[in-house]
Amino acid sequence: MNTENRSPEQFDIPLFLKNLPKLPGVYRFFDEGGKVLYVGKAVNLKRRVSGYFQKNDHSPRIALMVKQVHHIETTITRSEAEALILENNFIKALSPKYNILFRDDKSYPYLMLSGHQYPQMAYYRGTLKKPNQYFGPYPNSNAVRDSIQILQKVFMLRTCEDSVFEHRDRPCLLYQIKRCTAPCVGHISEEDYRDSVRQAATFLNGKTDELTRTLQHKMQTAAANLQFEEAARYRDQIQALGIMQSNQFIDSKNPNNPNDIDLLALAVSDGLVCVHWVSIRGGRHVGDKSFFPDTKNDPEPNGQDYAEAFVAQHYLGKSKPDIIINNFPVPDALKEALEGEHGKQMQFVTKTIGERKVWLKMAEQNAQMAIAQRRLQQSNQQHRIDELAKILGMDSDGLNRLECFDISHTQGEATIASCVVYDEQNIQPSQYRRYNITTAKPGDDYAAMREVLTRRYGKMQEAEANGETVKWPDAVLIDGGKGQIGIAVSVWEELGLHIPLVGIAKGPERKAGMEELILPFTGEVFRLPPNSPALHLLQTVRDESHRFAITGHRKKRDKARVTSSLSDIPGVGSKRRQALLTRFGGLRGVIAASREDLEKVEGISKALAETIYEHLH
C-alpha cells in the first residue's frame, strides 16, 4: 500500500491528475481548510479521479463537492477489494460531508451465553470475546430482550451478573416464577445446567427439529423411569417450542440446518432513500429496521449508489450472514471483500421464488411504508417549526437549530448541566454535551446556568475568532423560570449575542400542557394551547434536556458516593478500592461479600477485611 501526498499550499490539480497512476486505490478530496469532502475508491485512480474534473454530467451533490476541492490525496492498493475496505475505513473515521452516510454509530446488540462455569444469558453490545458464545446481530435491543424472555421460559437460564450469582444464599424471584433453575444455590447440577445451555444454543442456531427430537427422547426416557415431574418439564418445553415455531420464518430450502439470512430492500421516493433490513437467524425472524441516509445535498439520489454504500458500511468489518437476499445488484468487488472477511462463500440472491420471494416483497413494502411515515413525520416537524418561528417573529427558513439547557443536582450534590440539540427536524444525540459545574456554589442553579452558557458560547466565540467553522443555534431554550432566563439575558449582554431566547417554566400547577413561555426580549409571558404544535416541539426538546441532565447527574453522584463509601475506610486507598470494585462488580457486590470473600482480594488482610465489613454493615 502506498500513499501519495502533496503540500496543499502548492497543489496543482491538473499536474496532479497528469501524474496519477493507473492503479487501484483510494482518493480523498479536501477543501481549502483541510477538511475532507469526499472519499472514494477506484480500479484505475487516473481515470476515476480525472473524471471528476473532465465531465459535466455529475449529480448535484457531486457537482457541488467538486467546486470546493482544493487538494487531493491518494493511497494505492493491491486490488479493488482492498481499496473498498480501505475506503470504508476512511469514511467511518472521517465522516466526509459528501459521502453517503448511514448514521448508525452504535454496534449492533447480540445475545450472549458467557463462558462462566454456569453460563449467564445476557444482552451484549461491543467487541466479541472468547470463550463466550454470541448469537446475532439483532436489529435492536428489544429483539434481543424478546429472545431472552423466550429462552428464560423454555430453558430457565440465569441472567444475573456474576458478582450477584457468586454471593447469593437463596434463590431469587425468577426461580419462584420458573424462569431460572437457581444454579447459584445448587438447585441444578453443573452437568444438567450445561445441558440446558446446549439446548438453548441449538435453538438459537435454528436446529429446532433436532432439539425437539432430543427433548422427546428425554421425555420418554424419564417417563419410562417413572420420573414423571421431569417428563412433564420436557413435555412443557416441547409444547413451548411448537408455539414459537409457528410464529417464525422457517427456510424450507434447508429446514434442518437453517442459514443466517439478511433481507435488504431498497426504496427511493421523492428524494428520500430507505434500505430496510430484515434479520433471520437460525430460521427465526429476530427483527428488522429501516435506514435513512442523509440526502439533503442530493436532490436526485441514485438508489444503487446508496444501496452499495449501505452494504459496505453495514457489513465490512462486522458479522455477516451466509445469505443476503436483496432487490439490487451487489458489485463483484464488494462481494469479494465481504467473502474475504467472512472466510467462506456468501450467497447474494436477487432472483427469488417461493417463500423467499414473499419475504423480499414484504421487506420492499416495509421500505416504502417507512418512506411514507418519514414524509409524514417531516411534515409534522415542519408544522411545529413554522408555528414556533411565528411565535418568535422569525422566518421558518431561519429556524432550524435549537439548543436547550437544564441543570440537575441532588441538594447541591454532583451538579450537571446539559445541552441538547435539535437540528434538521430531529434531535441530534451525537451533538449533546454535559458540563460539570465547578465554579457555582452547591445548589445555586442561577450560577450554574451562568457558568454553562458562558463556557459554551464563549468557547464558540473563541473558535470562530480563530477561523474555525461554528454552528450557532437559531434559538436557545432555557428550562426554568424568570430567574433562569434573566441569567441567560445577562450572559447574552456580556458576550454580545443576539440569539432569540425562550424560557419554559412549569407553570403554577406544574402540569404538562400548562407550561408558561417567557420571551425576555419582548417581555411576554404566556401559555400555548395544550394541542399547539410549537408547544409539543418545545416539550420534546425540554424533556430530552431534562432526561440527559438527570442521567448524567445520577452517574456522577453514584460514582462519587461509591468512591466516598470505600475511601472513608481506614487502610483502603485508590488501588485497594479499585481491586474491590473490580472483584465484586461494584459497591453492591462489595457490600454483599462476606469477610472471607473480602480476604481473598489481593492486598486485603484478615484485619482489613473485618474493618471493611464492619464499616459497610
Curated annotation (Swiss-Prot):
GO terms for cellular component: cytoplasm; excinuclease repair complex. Transmembrane segments: none annotated. It is found in: Cytoplasm. Gene3D superfamilies: 5' to 3' exonuclease, C-terminal subdomain, GIY-YIG endonuclease, UVR domain, UvrC, RNAse H endonuclease domain. It comes from the Bacteria. The keyword Cytoplasm applies. Keywords: Cytoplasm, DNA damage, DNA excision, DNA repair, Excision nuclease, SOS response. Its main location: cytoplasm. GO terms for molecular function: DNA binding; excinuclease ABC activity. Residues 209-244 form the UVR domain. Residues 22-100 form the GIY-YIG domain. Disulfide bonds: none annotated. InterPro entries: GIY-YIG_endonuc (IPR000305), GIY-YIG_endonuc_sf (IPR035901), GIY-YIG_UvrC_Cho (IPR047296), Hlx-hairpin-Hlx_DNA-bd_motif (IPR003583), RuvA_2-like (IPR010994), UVR_dom (IPR001943), UVR_dom_sf (IPR036876), UvrABC_protein_C (IPR050066). SUPFAM superfamilies: C-terminal UvrC-binding domain of UvrB, GIY-YIG endonuclease, RuvA domain 2-like. One of its GO terms (biological process) is SOS response. The UvrABC repair system catalyzes the recognition and processing of DNA lesions. UvrC both incises the 5' and 3' sides of the lesion. The N-terminal half is responsible for the 3' incision and the C-terminal half is responsible for the 5' incision. PANTHER family: UVRABC SYSTEM PROTEIN C, UVRC/OXIDOREDUCTASE. HAMAP family: UvrC (MF_00203). Interacts with UvrB in an incision complex. Belongs to the UvrC family. This is UvrABC system protein C.
